[in-house]
């Protein structure tokens, strides 16, 4: 964990953050804390790479820790209220038996202290003590107790007792667990017996019930003459704040953190290790595929769950040795916080420790869930009712965080859907028939067999009613209510279904009590196979939702009976004589025949059915980098998300190139509809486009296609035309396989990464993948692994898919009654979510860069329809290119700047954001994107993650008048850190390389990049200007006399001046002290310069009204003096939204408009405080409503005036008088112009200041 920890106070919760937070992280933490406090649900979108995982972990865990602190404080107050009533010492037998024990000493200490505090008569009472108590006073324990009592009562507080009360139960429980684990009964018990007891609820290891039963208080007989035993139990319960003893006030919710895959869990736990909360008790729930270490089970390719159960049952005479050692792993010091050595761990850490201790990681992780504060798991563990039941997950009153939740709707529907084939039903019926015929729980199995027989008979009868829907496919669909009528005919009703559930529970019991010779003994009973159990449990799960709440969800289901054909191979053995004369031919040995497959599908079309089980959850937080469009979540899930947020990305606009391309290199239109993708012209044009991009962009490139079918078509076509070979000459080409083993896919990824890492003759690699495939979900392609992402077309779901068709009709049917989106709109949203997920593979962290290329003519022709579905940070920067040539030229210039090793510092000194070649003037949207809007009185204290403030000296230029930047300052800056601002050369920046250094710059051996590094690391960021160096002045003056003809030459002089300034005024204070002063500056072109854009010559205007060198400069443009500000900084999340409209940017901020976006619920009504030990001294009045730092502008003009004054002294008297007169006129004009342009949206306070 980083030593530079920042502390923020949000909603009354102190959050320890491992570094200074991004604005998007502050907004997320504020939203989460508000949702947790108010029991509201949150829907938060934050782009990948913006640090949303850290924000989720720190905010949720800090809120949980605050509840522990409140509970501890409350228990200490309750103890102080209770102790005066227990002033008389206890006279029971249990106390007299342990006179000198620590418990007795503590009780006498508490009584004496209470008497002294309440009545003040403890001395008199001490004279009347009995002989036994007088004898006790002579012991060592009594002397120590007296010292403690004197210390506690002298301070008139109960700190010592509170601390002792909090520690003692933990030590006692730990000793009890050790005695319990190393007792002979536990060591010698059979694995089958332990497993059965746990299934029956007779043995619950480390649960609240078992801890209570094995507590020291229950080891002795309770005393009935006094309330000592109840007092002990009360103290014990108060120590365990997780128990719901006094209602919701003492119940501390667990945090269930769900992600999509196990690999994402590993990424989350790595982030947890960075935080101050890495010591919280945790566990990771996962499948046996990841955690089983048994050599036989783990090496098997079959169902590991079945093999594990067989070992636990000891069917083959062998038991699982690793299961016996679960307690050794769950109580190991590396996983327990009692030893203060606890750290966050990953599945790999648990597995390696389990192998070392020969203990089962799978069951150990489940045991650790009892005492864990945060539980990580794939989120289908929380949505699937069968998995929740098997893992014993209780979500009532808990906090559920679902990361990467863009597919949560599909996952919720799949969790409560079920499909079974006719052959599976027949196999289950035959096995149940076998149980009945052998008199094995005959009554129970008969009822289940009758249900399966009725269902198979109905399936056969219905198969004759199927309607052909395609080639060799036919189906028939029933609604849920219609299917209930059929179940009623089978004898399955809402009355008989609970009886069937009891029969199912009975047949799954592996043991049964049987009376033999007058004694009851447990006898093992055979049960049905795992395959039959899966069939029965799946059917009963669907029936449960169909009958639930008086068939409330029946209309949300569709039952589809599908008939398809499958080809099977009959590998018949060779039948030949010894001479092999009559051997069968090869084609006759491998016979293939077509078989009919009937599939019965119970499809849930409403994800709210699965989420109905989460109604008792305290707070649900859904977050992802690609939640957009966000309109469907509330209606689809049936959950009211009171808090919604679309956060901005943390990268600069110059780090990403986003463009749409509608034509190929040969000028053919590219529209990836089904009709066009079938033509050779489209396939060849896409191939030529892909080859051109690979030649211009180095390193790794990802290309996403809508479907595997199109991928196969393109690959076959390109191999036939030779284009595939041309691609392989440039890059290593890899195509994503459909299906296959995980190991094969991992091997292909390794080839891709190695081709980029170890460069040879080829420049990187090209990975052609499919949206919604393996590559587009959960994989991290950072830095050179994905310098460009190309998407071909829009990945709409298959319109001919029966489930998609039924879902669209379902939404159209209920769009008015339930507020669902229309079917067509839902259909489009599914496409954009998949597209955004594919685009999110690029730009994975703050310093990353890459290009996003959207190939389809529909984006340019109808942007209002097709662009609005993209993520917020992408749609704000989309540029439409008329032809492929201009797009490729702009893309090549973008890649050249970054691939040549030009760091962001020197790059950002010449540009603010990317504008393509066909853009003549920066648009209003682009100007909005170049800024982060701040409140006029809210200075931002930024961090190591934040942007770097503008550090260049600003000059007044006739043709360009750049305004100061508003980027927050004061953070640490590394080589990759840079500012947003500087003189903007938008028109030719993307197409022409950087101009060489001018003569002034060549005089120095140091580059502008070196100057920037030194300047950012050592120059104190302050609003008070420092004296300008002499060489800096001479440089500026020489620049003025030369009639500068280009902006680049002027920038060189300013950089040289700046470097000299930095070298002479390098501070001697530590770097940490240089981070304390922040100011905000904005780098957009001021409107006042528009009338001078046609002028060719640039010259520096001296300002005669500013003081000369050596004098104390004052703020001349807006005469406002800087004021010291309180250390606490206040934020609201909407301040960090840099996608506001131009009207909102130019008008004053309205308090009623403090919403995140477009009328959505407010994220932050309450301001949250950032507490820091660093001293802040920021002029509150320096920032206008539009984000311009007028104070800094005046400061920079002061520095320029010093240079100008030296130049004026060298002139003749006539020239000097003429120059000064010219300066005065220009300054007055400029002040008038500034008043027109900068007072737009200025607060009344600033307007009053300027008028003075």
From Swiss-Prot:
One Pfam family this sequence matches: DEAD_2
Recorded catalytic activity of this chain's protein: Couples ATP hydrolysis with the unwinding of duplex DNA at the replication fork by translocating in the 5'-3' direction. This creates two antiparallel DNA single strands (ssDNA). The leading ssDNA polymer is the template for DNA polymerase III holoenzyme which synthesizes a continuous strand; ATP + H2O = ADP + phosphate + H(+)
Record's compositionally biased regions (Acidic residues): 1215-1224
Comp. bias regions, Basic residues: 1228-1239
Compartments it resides in: Nucleus
UniProt motif DEAH box: location: 403-406
SUPFAM superfamilies linked: P-loop containing nucleoside triphosphate hydrolases
CDD domains documented for this protein: SF2_C_XPD
Cofactor names: [4Fe-4S] cluster
Bias (Basic and acidic residues) ranges: 989-1008
Biological processes annotated in GO: DNA repair; double-strand break repair involved in meiotic recombination; nucleotide-excision repair; protein-DNA covalent cross-linking repair
Biased composition (Polar residues): 920-930, 952-969
Alphabetized UniProt keyword annotations: 4Fe-4S, ATP-binding, DNA damage, DNA repair, Helicase, Hydrolase, Iron, Iron-sulfur, Isomerase, Metal-binding, Nucleotide-binding, Nucleus
GO molecular function, a single term: 5'-3' DNA helicase activity
Binding-site list for ATP: 191-198
One term under GO cellular component: nucleoplasm
Binding site for [4Fe-4S] cluster: 292, 308, 320, 360
Ranges for domain Helicase ATP-binding: 11-452
Gene3D superfamilies: P-loop containing nucleotide triphosphate hydrolases
Role noted for this protein: DNA-dependent helicase and 5' to 3' DNA helicase required for the maintenance of chromosomal stability. Involved in the repair of DNA double-strand breaks by homologous recombination. Involved in the repair of abasic sites at replication forks by promoting the degradation of DNA-protein cross-links: acts by catalyzing unfolding of HMCES DNA-protein cross-link via its helicase activity, exposing the underlying DNA and enabling cleavage of the DNA-protein adduct by the SPRTN metalloprotease.
Domain notes: 4Fe-4S iron-sulfur-binding is required for helicase activity.
Family classification: Belongs to the DEAD box helicase family. DEAH subfamily.
Entry-linked PANTHER family: DNA REPAIR DEAD HELICASE RAD3/XP-D SUBFAMILY MEMBER (PTHR11472), FANCONI ANEMIA GROUP J PROTEIN (PTHR11472:SF47)
Protein name from the UniProt record: Fanconi anemia group J protein homolog
Organism: Gallus gallus (Chicken)
């Amino acid at each position: 964990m980083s030593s530079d920890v920042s502390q923020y106070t949000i909603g009354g919760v102190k959050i320890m953050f491992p570094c200074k937070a991004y604005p998007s992280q502050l907004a997320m933490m504020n939203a989460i804390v508000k949702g947790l406090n108010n029991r509201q649900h949150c829907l938060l979108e934050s782009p990948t790479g913006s640090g949303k995982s850290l924000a989720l972990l720190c905010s949720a865990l800090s809120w949980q820790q605050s509840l522990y602190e409140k509970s501890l404080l409350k228990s200490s107050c309750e103890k102080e209220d209770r102790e005066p009533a227990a002033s008389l010492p206890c006279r029971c037998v249990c106390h007299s038996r342990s006179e000198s024990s620590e418990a007795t000493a503590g009780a006498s200490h508490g009584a004496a202290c209470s008497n002294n505090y309440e009545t003040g008569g403890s001395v008199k009472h001490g004279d009347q003590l009995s002989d036994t108590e007088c004898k006790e006073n002579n012991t060592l324990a009594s002397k120590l107790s007296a010292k403690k009592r004197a210390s506690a009562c002298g301070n008139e507080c109960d700190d010592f007792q509170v601390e002792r009360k909090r520690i003692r139960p933990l030590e006692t429980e730990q000793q009890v667990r050790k005695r319990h684990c190393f007792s002979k009964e536990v060591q010698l018990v059979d694995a089958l017996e332990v497993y059965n007891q746990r299934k029956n609820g007779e043995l619950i290891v480390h649960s609240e019930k078992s801890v209570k039963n094995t507590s020291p208080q229950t080891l002795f007989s309770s005393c009935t003459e006094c309330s000592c035993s109840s007092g002990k139990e009360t103290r014990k319960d108060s120590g365990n704040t997780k128990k719901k003893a006094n209602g919701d006030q003492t119940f501390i919710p667990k945090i269930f953190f769900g992600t999509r895959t196990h690999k994402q869990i590993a990424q989350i736990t790595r982030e947890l290790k960075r935080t101050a909360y890495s010591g919280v008790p945790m566990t990771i729930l996962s499948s046996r595929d990841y955690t089983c270490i048994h050599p036989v089970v783990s090496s098997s390719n079959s169902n590991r769950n079945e093999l594990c159960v067989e070992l636990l049952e000891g069917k083959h005479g062998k038991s699982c040795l690793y299961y016996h050692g679960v307690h050794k792993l769950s109580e190991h010091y590396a996983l327990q916080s009692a030893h203060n050595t606890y750290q966050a761990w990953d599945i790999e850490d648990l597995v390696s420790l389990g192998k070392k201790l020969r203990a089962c990681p799978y069951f150990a992780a489940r045991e650790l869930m009892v005492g864990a504060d945060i539980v990580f798991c794939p989120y289908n563990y929380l949505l699937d009712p069968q998995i929740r039941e098997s893992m014993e997950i209780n979500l009532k009153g808990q906090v559920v965080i679902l990361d990467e939740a863009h597919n949560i709707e599909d996952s919720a529907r799949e969790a409560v859907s079920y499909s079974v084939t006719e052959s599976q039903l027949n196999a289950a019926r035959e096995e149940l028939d076998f149980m009945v015929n052998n008199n094995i729980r005959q009554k129970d199995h008969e009822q289940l067999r009758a249900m399966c027989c009725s269902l198979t008979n109905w399936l056969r009868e219905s198969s004759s009613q199927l309607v052909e829907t395609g080639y060799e496919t036919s189906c028939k669909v029933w609604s849920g209510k219609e299917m209930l009528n059929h179940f009623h005919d089978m004898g399955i009703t809402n009355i008989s279904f609970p009886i069937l559930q009891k029969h199912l529970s009975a047949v799954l019991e592996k043991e049964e009590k049987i009376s033999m010779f007058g004694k009851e003994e447990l006898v093992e009973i055979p049960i049905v196979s795992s395959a039959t159990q899966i069939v029965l449990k799946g059917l009963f799960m669907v029936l449960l939702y169909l009958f639930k709440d008086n068939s409330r969800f029946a209309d949300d289901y569709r039952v589809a009976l599908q008939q398809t054909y499958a080809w099977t191979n009959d590998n018949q053995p060779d039948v030949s004589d010894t001479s092999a004369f009559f051997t069968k031919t090869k084609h006759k040995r491998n016979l293939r025949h077509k078989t009919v497959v009937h599939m019965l599908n119970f499809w849930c079309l409403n994800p709210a059915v699965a989420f109905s089980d989460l109604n008792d959850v305290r707070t649900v937080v859904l977050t992802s980098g690609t939640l957009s469009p966000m309109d469907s979540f509330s209606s689809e899930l049936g959950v009211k998300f009171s808090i919604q947020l679309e956060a901005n990305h943390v990268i600069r606009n110059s780090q990403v190139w986003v463009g749409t391309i509608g034509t190929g290199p040969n000028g053919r239109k590219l529209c990836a509809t089904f009709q066009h993708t079938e033509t050779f012209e489209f396939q060849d044009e896409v191939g030529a486009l892909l080859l051109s991009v690979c030649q211009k962009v180095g390193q790794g490139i990802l290309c996403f296609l809508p479907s595997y079918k199109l991928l196969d078509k393109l690959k076959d076509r390109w191999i036939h035309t030779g284009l595939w070979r041309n691609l392989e000459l440039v890059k290593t080409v890899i195509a994503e396989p459909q299906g296959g083993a995980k190991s094969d896919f991992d091997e292909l990824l390794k080839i891709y990464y190695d081709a980029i890492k170890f460069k040879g003759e080829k420049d990187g690699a090209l990975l052609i993948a499919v949206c919604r495939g393996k590559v587009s979900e959960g994989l991290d392609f950072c830095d050179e692994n994905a310098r460009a992402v190309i998407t071909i077309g829009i990945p709409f779901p298959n319109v001919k898919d029966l489930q998609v068709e039924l879902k669209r009709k379902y939404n159209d049917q209920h769009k008015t009654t339930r507020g669902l989106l229309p079917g067509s709109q839902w259909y489009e949203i599914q496409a954009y979510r998949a597209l955004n997920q594919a685009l999110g593979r690029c730009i994975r962290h703050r310093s990353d860069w890459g290009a996003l290329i959207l190939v389809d003519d529909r984006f340019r022709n109808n942007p209002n329809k097709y662009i609005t579905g993209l993520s917020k940070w992408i749609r704000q920067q989309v540029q439409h290119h008329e032809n492929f040539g201009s797009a490729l030229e702009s893309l090549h210039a973008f890649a050249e700047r970054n691939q040549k090793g030009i760091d962001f510092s020197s790059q950002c000194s010449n540009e603010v954001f990317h504008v393509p070649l066909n853009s003549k003037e920066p648009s209003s949207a682009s100007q909005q994107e170049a800024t982060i809007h701040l409140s006029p009185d809210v200075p931002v204290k930024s961090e190591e993650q934040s942007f770097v403030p503008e550090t260049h000296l600003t000059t007044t230029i006739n043709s360009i008048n750049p305004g100061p930047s508003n980027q927050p300052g004061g953070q640490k800056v590394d080589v990759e850190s840079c500012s947003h601002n500087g003189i903007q050369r938008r028109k030719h920046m993307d197409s022409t390389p950087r101009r060489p250094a001018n003569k002034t710059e060549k005089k120095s051996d140091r580059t502008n990049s070196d100057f920037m590094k030194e300047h950012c690391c050592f120059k104190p960021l302050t609003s008070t200007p420092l004296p300008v160096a002499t060489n800096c002045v001479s440089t500026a003056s020489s620049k003025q006399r030369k009639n500068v003809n280009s902006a680049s030459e002027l920038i060189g002089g300013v950089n040289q001046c700046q470097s000299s300034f930095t070298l002479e005024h390098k501070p001697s204070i530590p770097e940490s002290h240089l981070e304390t002063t922040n100011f905000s500056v904005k780098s957009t072109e001021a409107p006042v310069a528009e009338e001078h854009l046609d002028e060719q010559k640039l010259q520096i205007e001296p300002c005669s009204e500013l003081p000369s060198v050596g004098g104390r400069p004052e703020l001349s443009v807006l005469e406002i003096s800087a004021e010291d500000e309180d250390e606490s900084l206040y934020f609201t999340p909407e301040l960090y939204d840099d996608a506001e409209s131009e009207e909102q940017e130019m008008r004053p901020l309205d308090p009623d408009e403090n919403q995140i976006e477009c009328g959505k619920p407010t994220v932050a009504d309450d301001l949250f405080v950032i507490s820091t030990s660093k001293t802040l001294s920021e002029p509150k009045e320096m920032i206008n409503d539009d984000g311009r730092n007028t104070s800094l502008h005046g400061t920079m003009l002061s520095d320029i005036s010093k240079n100008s004054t030296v130049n004026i002294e060298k002139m003749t008297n006539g020239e000097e008088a003429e120059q000064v007169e010219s300066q005065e006129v220009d300054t007055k004009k400029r002040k008038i112009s500034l008043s027109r342009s900068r007072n737009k949206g200025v607060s009344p306070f600033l307007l009053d200041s300027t008028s003075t």
